[in-house]
Every structure is written in structure tokens, then in C-alpha cells.
Amino acid sequence: MDKIFSHGGFSQRLPSASALGKIFSAMPLGDPLYQMLELKLAIYVDFPCEMKPGLLVTCADDIELYSIAEDEIVRFNKPGFTALAHPSPLSIGTTHGVFVLDSHKKSTNSEMETISCLRFLHKPSIDKMRNCGAVLKRQSGCFSLSDPEFVYTDSTYYVDFNTAKSLLNVLKELGTLDCEIDAYGDFLQALGPKATMDYTNNTANVTTKERGLVEVRQKIFHLLHETPLNVILLNNSKFYHIGTTSEYLFHLTEDVALRSELGLMSSAFSGHMNKPSERAFGSCVMYSVLDSSCSVGSGSVVEYCRLGAGVTIGEGSLISSCWVRLGLSVPGRVFMHSLCVNHLGQTGFVTVVFGISDNLKHSVKASANLEGLKLFGLCLAECLSHWETENEVLRFSGDPSSCSLWNACLFPVCTDQQSSFLMSLEMLQAAMQGSTFTLPKETKLISMQESLQFKNLEEMLAFRMGLYNDITQRNLNS
């Protein structure tokens, strides 16, 4: 049996996970700190012994917790695909996969039931869920959901060995792929007796519209459309999605249910003061070294950071992989993340900064339409004016016809990590306070997209190793 953990793609909604992938996102558990990978393996520890040879595919940005009766076992032993399904509100279904079940075969209200699936819908509208028969009425019993109506949404699925071999043969036939295939949308939508080919031409949920995608989807459909899709209904289960900055902050700082169910900590594998008054209730600090005079606001997460004396972090912010000089104050509701890059033959550092609610995926067709892009809740053109930068000078990396915060070259490359953080913070403060900040001459600006292309993972991991050594030494001395 093989396991496939999707690393999380571009992680445009949680950019702190972009460099390494969401599967390596920090979780406030353990000593040393657990990552999502370890948590997933712990949750699935009982699966392998009840699984025939095949593949198990799971996402890197969700947590599934479930309860079943002592005499029930989750088994992956049927031909074709077998997917786990969780009762969810209709609103959750619009951003996930939804199963259309054969309601005539659903006979019990037990905690677990295996049933055949007629069709899989990928991020459908509520109207489509209703029209396709995916919406069900809640009945009394073991359901953990209180909504009167619900749908079954996806999480993890299994592919038996023979089906996996067939997919491998298709890959060999296609040769080198020139397009990105979605392990959920492009495979599961082909399954079930009521599946149609309509989805193969729908590119609404595709990050980059690449040539050949429709043809590849159609080949996959013709291969899989008669393959069975079995669904294991986990009626007493909870599905937590943590793939956005807002979700990450909420579940790690405010979600009382998840914190109690998993035993999440407010401070995990960190070297700092033990005075509770210095760290607001509902904050989360992971794998970081903080001076005893630091203050972290409620609802904020600090991970893989060094914070100097007197540093204050506002409420509801996410600060990741940063080295913050003494005395600096970070506003609330902002995202700041430092990366090491190899740029123009030299090692440098970039700190990207966005508002927590900024939409990095939203794009406009030309750089002349900057009023359509919002940074820190402000029009991007207004931010540029505070940095004494002309709209026409702003460069966008990658596809020139798609201009977004993701590929806007806004962030200065600096020689060291502390200077990088300071300069980006000064740009943020100028925009939010309506003041002016002038970039030093010859400063090179790159985008978040380019930061990933130029990333120097060795240096980024070396920074974490330095934190590890300091934290371990402090814990030994305490």
C-alpha cells in the first residue's frame, strides 16, 4: 500500500505554506513540534491493516476526526475507488467535493455505512447540489451536524491496485504532461453511473488554464467512467479545513472544539517567557524564540520566528519564518512571511506582507486596472503612491495577461533577514498610516510567485535548525 499526501499546491490562500507545502504546516502539538504530516499519519494509523494493495490519497490542509462503534472498521478492500465522506453544511460543499448517493441503498443511521455513489460534484453551487440530488435531510441519530439539510463532502480516498495501474498506463500513453491534473476534481468526477463529460471543459476552478487539459481530462474520463465509486459515510465525524490564513488562525487560536479534541497548545516547542500575561489568551506560538518582553495579540499565530526585546504583534496576525528586531510593532490582521532567495546570483531575503483578508488569487487582465486589486484593504494604486512608485513602473511576473497580488513585484530583496522584515514592515506602515516610504535606490522588487521560483530551502531550513538548537538548549537549562 502506498500513501500520497498532496503537498498543497501553490497555497495561495496560505502563503506561509507555499515554500515547503501544506503537508509540512506546523501543528501546535508535540516536542519537537508536529507537522501536518505526523498528524495525518497518526489519524490514519489503523488504515493500512484493513487496506488491500493500492493508493491512499489525502489533502494536506484538512483534519478529519471521526467516531465509529467498536464493532465497525473502516476498510478499503473494494475494487475501484473508495472515499471517506463527512456530513457538512451546504456552504462547505460549495468549496469541496460533494457525493451524490444512491439514496435507495442508504438504509441506516449508524455511525458508519458503505454505499455506492452515483456521481461526484467538484465545488458545486447550492442549486447544482439540489438539482443533482446531493442535498439530504438530517435525521435523528448519531449525526454531529445540527443543520436541517446537509451534503456529504470528500476528504481522503483509496484507489485499488488494478485501477492505479490503469492510470499509470494512461500517463505512459500521454507522455510528459503539459498541464496540471487535480487528484480530486479530474479523477473523481469521472466516476459513478451518472457522471458526465461536462466537467472536462469547465476550467473555472483551474489556477492556470493550460493547453491540453481538456484532452487529458477526456482520456481520464473514458478510462474511469465505469469504475465503481464506493463511499464510506462517517456520520459522526468532523471535517476541519485549515487551508486559508483565516482558517489557520481560527482553528489554532479560537476553535475551542478542535483545541480540546486534539489537545492543541497555545505554546508549542518554543523558547520564551512563561508569564501568561505577556501572551494574550487565544494566541499560538510555535517553534519560535521570543524575548520575555514580547507581546503576542489575541488570535495571532507566530511560527518559526525570532522576536527581539519589546516586539509586539497585533491581534489576528500570522507571522511566519521572520526575524524581528527589538522594539518593532506589527499591526493586527496582517500576514508577514520571510523567504530566503537566490536572486541574480546572490543570496537574499524577501518578506512578503499582505492583509489577512487580501485575495491573492483575484486577478485583473492588465496592469492598467490596478483599482481592481486590494492590498491591506486599500487600492493597490494607493499603496504604490505611498511608496512613491508610479503605476506604470510596477512589474507583474509570469503571465502578463493575469495581474494579481500573487505575481505583483512589490517586495524588496535585502541582504539579511532582519532588514528584509523591517523594510516590508515600513512599507506596510506607510500604506496603513497614509505616510510616505521611499525605497533605497537600486532596490530589486520581486513577487510572491518569484520568491518561490528563487527560494533557497537550504538556508530557510538552516534558520529553523538554529531555532531548534536554541529552543532545545533553553529547555535543558530551564
What are these regions (language model features)?
Residues G80-F81, S88-S91, R138-F143, D147-S478:
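Left-handed beta-helix
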Residues F24-S25, T244:
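Lumenal/extracellular "mature" regions of secretory-pathway glycan-modifying transferases
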Residues L14-P15, S67, F250:
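Generic hydrophobic alpha-helical membrane-span motif
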Residues M1-K3, K52-L55, L229:
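Residue-level recognition of the N-termini of beta-strands and the immediately preceding loop/turn
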Residues Q12-R13, L101, E247-Y248:
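Short, electropositive, low-hydrophobicity segments enriched in small/polar residues
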Residues F5-H7, T58, Y157, H241:
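Short conserved micro-motifs on helix faces and helix-strand junctions that flank
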Residues S18-A19, S25-T176, L233, R464:
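Conserved core of the sugar-phosphate nucleotidyltransferase
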Residues D2-S16:
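N-terminal nucleotide-binding beta1-loop-alpha1 segment
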